[in-house]
Amino acid sequence: MAFKIIETASALPANIVTNDDLTAIMETSNEWIESRTGILERRISETENTSDLCLRVAQTLLDKSGIAVSQIKAIIVATMTPDYYTPSTAAIVQGRLGADQAFAFDISAACSGFTYALSAARGYVQTPDDYVLVIGGEVISKMLDWSDRSTAVLFGDGAAGVLLQGTTSDQESWVSEKLITIGTESDQLVSGYAPVKRPNFGQVGQTQVGIDFFKMTGKAIYQFSTRRVPKAIEAAVLEAGLTLDQIDHFLVHQANSRLITKMASMLDQPLTKFPMNLQHYGNTSAASIPLLLAEQVETNQIKRGDLCVLCGFGGGLTIGIQIIRY
């Protein structure tokens, strides 16, 4: 069964932190950040957690579509910064939304999370009466070492998502997908390490959980992104029976403007096909692709019938590609 995307929505913290703001807390400059990443500012949450942002997205999707909460079959949240280890962020959203009949779960695939969540959602849109909320949301700021300019300047908080409906018509959105995991390189990007520090059996007192800051081997991730991701996009498009020239928009993970520019060049496609909004939001991980999609739809840059490649890549290491006709 394929799906149709019937609505998009996003939610962002109100607090804007510019590159100049960061110079007050770390040794950096606007020029240093912008020249290396393309980022000018990002949203940093002051009070909202991941579930709060995702709930705003879910409610907006319902409001825009006119679909009743009782019609929602499933809620899938892609995040690497959940409120808790358990319950899932999706379960919190389900409860606060009042979607009592819906089942809910999280997917953790870092910056590929939204594309993996779309893949999972396909199994639950079996009839036109099936509606599924798929949301990517992150509050990465709570996991950052704000003294480390190599990582702290890159990220921002936010959430965005889509409302899917099952369809048997020729108006379906889904065309093809390609998911890749390279677990042998999983140590290149890690966050929230929870080691077994001591046996817990028989111990009195609260269990100790080790939380570590977000850490990334920048050079290795960049090489992975340029070495593997363009080839994966090319292969996914070919496997779908399409050519790169037929793709109207490449919505790739908003990690770095120089990286995206290089990808466009490697695929021999015009940069105009690779929209960017990272200058305003930074790297929002699982929220990155749906945030860009929602913005492009809202501004009428993406229209019904446009052929789009959604490509996430990052921790895992993972690559997730969904080819859709919006």
From Swiss-Prot:
Question: What is one process in the GO biological process aspect for this record?
Answer: fatty acid biosynthetic process
According to the record, the residues making up region (ACP-binding) are 254-258
Q: Which Pfam families match?
A: ACP_syn_III, ACP_syn_III_C
| A cellular-component GO term for this protein | cytoplasm
Which EC number(s) are documented for this chain?
2.3.1.180
- Please describe the quaternary structure of this protein: Homodimer.
| Name of the protein this chain belongs to | Beta-ketoacyl-[acyl-carrier-protein] synthase III
Does Ribosomal protein count among this protein's keywords?
Answer: no
Domain comment quoted from the record: The last Arg residue of the ACP-binding site is essential for the weak association between ACP/AcpP and FabH.
The primary site where this protein sits is cytoplasm
Question: Which family does the entry's similarity section mention?
Answer: Belongs to the thiolase-like superfamily. FabH family.
Q: Which pathway does UniProt place it in?
A: Lipid metabolism; fatty acid biosynthesis
What are the record keywords, sorted? Acyltransferase, Cytoplasm, Fatty acid biosynthesis, Fatty acid metabolism, Lipid biosynthesis, Lipid metabolism, Multifunctional enzyme, Transferase
Q: Which SUPFAM superfamilies match?
A: Thiolase-like (SSF53901)
Q: Where are the transmembrane segments?
A: none
Active-site residues? 111, 253, 283
This protein's record includes keyword Magnesium? no
The record lists the catalysed reaction(s) as: malonyl-[ACP] + acetyl-CoA + H(+) = 3-oxobutanoyl-[ACP] + CO2 + CoA
